């Protein structure tokens, strides 16, 4: 009988590294599906974990103020049917305007104002995963606004 399975699995710089008992090291890369969007994968690649990885230290993971991170939250909310179409449309438009500004380190007071207005318009009531995602989306929009203002 062959014993198999993973001793440990870790995410680092866009890949999943697994220490498999029988084979050794497996390296996987995620692909978009109905359960995971391209935006979520791109946002995960942006996660700041530090250059040295020691999972036992359990450093907090942070994400930059970037439109792809906001879009990842939007995808999660849309998958749960927790984002109204008109809100999603408005958010998409303002993130479309913000993306080249962030990518090219440019500023726009008008786009920053629109981002803050979109953040303020989000209904972040209740608790649970939906409220946590809405709060994270709102906070990300404000941080993007700060970055482009």
What feature does the model see in each segment?
Residues 1-77:
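Feature marking well-ordered beta-strand scaffolds used for ligand recognition
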Residues 45-149:
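Mature extracytoplasmic or organellar-lumen-exposed domains after removal of signal/transit peptides
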